[in-house]
Amino acid sequence: MNYHISDRMASMRPSMVREILKATSDPSVIPFAAGNPAPNAFPVEQVQQIVGQILAERPIEALQYSITEGYPPLREALRQLCASHYGIPMREQDDLIVLSGAQQGMDLATKVLCNEGDTVLCEDPSFIGSLNCFRSYHVNLVGVPMEEDGISLPALEEALQREKNVRMLYLIPNFQNPTGITTSLEKRRELYRICAEAGVMILEDNPYGDLRFSGEAIPSLKSMDTEGIVIYVGSFSKILAPGVRVGWTIAPKPLIAKMTVGKQCADVHTTILTQMLCERWLATCDLQAHLARLQEIYRQKCALMLDCIDREFSPKVTHTTPQGGLFLWCTLPEGADMLDFCNRAVAEKVAVVPGVAFLADENAPCRSVRMNFSTPTDEAIVTGCQRLGRLTRELF
């Protein structure tokens, strides 16, 4: 049978990252293309204990329907966490709802703010999951080039003047996926001013902010939001576990009201059992000690990968030096064929993600690849960098 596919989905393709991971599911392939937290980062025993307690003490509440906005004790815990830990006080103008993972925040923000043909600006490169979300709403997706301290402000101003119906700017200010770049405080203040003057919303995605292993923490854009133009999205995926699928968003109340309606249509509410797990975990864990442990795991793994790259790779290959997060960005020399390099890497049993997957314009030229240091073992990092190093020295 010939099935009719909607215009909205006919042009959509699977994430290149997912396709690469599928193609390299062979356990002998070293997964530099992945983006998962380190397996030893999960507080498994705590989760087992908390879930057992919840099901023993409050089984019906955990398994029953609930309200779309989120489990009330978790919402209150998140308000307190945002104020005390993230420096984001709950202003009178704002409200908070629980999400089924941070990805739902991108979907709901786009659904609420954008009509077909409206413009969404994003860092170029940017997170492929969000890019595909924006594309699914048939917006005009425009990338703004990145610099070593965040998005290019002259290019942002030029895009705001050039493009029509710009509804929002999507940013990952901390340890950006895929580059590992962090937006400086000065640049955050200035891009906030630019967007406020232009009347453009900022969608601030902060899944990696707690994974800082060097340097000083930088205030979020939401903490500066006196004009009500920032939608902030947080997540438990990198600090607890991605499998719980719990995130949250703080946004102006009129937008939260519409996002709640959109969420009702999408999934009714986030799973109550995992919301209860997150609330009790926040109440019982030593969060600062837990985060310090995660930061040390990723500090060591990142340092190992950087050391191996500097030792093994051709000096013509450059890379970012992240202060946190899970990723770094390697750029091949002028004239290099990035896709050929990625295919040769797979032949050497090492998977990296071609940088073109992260561009707003998938046909634009790109000489970079994303490398992940959180998923592979230390031994795999060393072996994988040795294999890629030989390849870079042969080619460049």
Please provide the spans of the model-predicted regions.
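PLP-dependent enzyme catalytic core of the Aspartate aminotransferase-like
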Residues: 1, 347, 362-396
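N-terminal small-domain helix-loop-helix segment of the aminotransferase-like
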Residues: 8-101, 108, 283-284, 351, ...
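Helix C-cap/helix->beta junction micro-motif
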Residues: 27, 137, 197-198, 228, ...
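Conserved PLP cofactor-binding pocket of PLP-dependent enzymes
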Residues: 29, 207, 346-370
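Conserved core of the PLP fold type I
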Residues: 61-198, 203, 209-227, 298, ...
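Conserved core segment of the aminotransferase class I/II
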Residues: 226-296
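Conserved glycine-rich beta-strand-loop-beta hairpin in the small C-terminal domain of fold type I
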Residues: 279, 296-306, 318-331
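Conserved PLP-binding catalytic core of the aspartate aminotransferase-like
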Residues: 316-349
